[in-house]
Swiss-Prot record:
The keyword Coiled coil does not apply. Belongs to the HIV-1 REV protein family. This is Protein Rev. HIV-1 lineages are divided in three main groups, M (for Major), O (for Outlier), and N (for New, or Non-M, Non-O). The vast majority of strains found worldwide belong to the group M. Group O seems to be endemic to and largely confined to Cameroon and neighboring countries in West Central Africa, where these viruses represent a small minority of HIV-1 strains. The group N is represented by a limited number of isolates from Cameroonian persons. The group M is further subdivided in 9 clades or subtypes (A to D, F to H, J and K). It comes from the Viruses. Residues 18-26 are annotated as: Homomultimerization. The modification Phosphoserine is found at S5, S8, S92. Residues 26-50, 82-107 are annotated as: Disordered. Its main location: host cell. Residues 36-50 have a biased composition (Basic residues). One of its GO terms (biological process) is viral process. Keywords: AIDS, Host cytoplasm, Host nucleus, Host-virus interaction, Methylation, mRNA transport, Phosphoprotein, RNA-binding, Transport. The gene is rev. The RNA-binding motif binds to the RRE, a 240 bp stem-and-loop structure present in incompletely spliced viral pre-mRNAs. This region also contains the NLS which mediates nuclear localization via KPNB1 binding and, when the N-terminal sequence is present, nucleolar targeting. These overlapping functions prevent Rev bound to RRE from undesirable return to the nucleus. When Rev binds the RRE, the NLS becomes masked while the NES remains accessible. The leucine-rich NES mediates binding to human XPO1.
């Protein structure tokens, strides 16, 4: 895979194989029995699926070495932040230059 070393490729492939085995070990329940029995089997199946999903996330985060969540948005330095209550356009939260401002729609 591009941008990765061979060792991490093998570790990633091994993690994917483990996750695949986990999901294959929990097949969807068979549609037989009473309505209540089927409902209980589906409920237990969904609970196992949630557990498998959380285990899979832990395996991947350990293997890849980064959290599954995206990196938080980087804000500009605190000195450049201000509260602007005007209705003019521009990026909110950052100071705009005080030069010529063109207003659309004003005569």
């Amino acid at each position: 895979m591009a941008g990765r070393s061979g060792d991490s490729d093998e570790a990633l492939l091994q993690a994917v194989r483990i996750i695949k085995i986990l999901y294959q070990s929990n097949p969807y329940p068979k549609p037989e029995g009473t309505r209540q029995a089927r409902r209980n089997r589906r409920r237990r199946w969904r609970a196992r699926q949630r557990q498998i999903h959380s285990i899979s996330e832990r395996i991947l985060s350990t293997c890849v070495g980064r959290p599954a969540e995206p990196v938080p948005f980087q804000l500009p330095p605190i000195e450049r932040l201000n509260i602007n209550c005007s209705e003019s356009g521009g990026t909110s939260g950052t100071q705009q230059p005080q030069g010529n401002t063109e207003r659309v729609g004003n005569p």
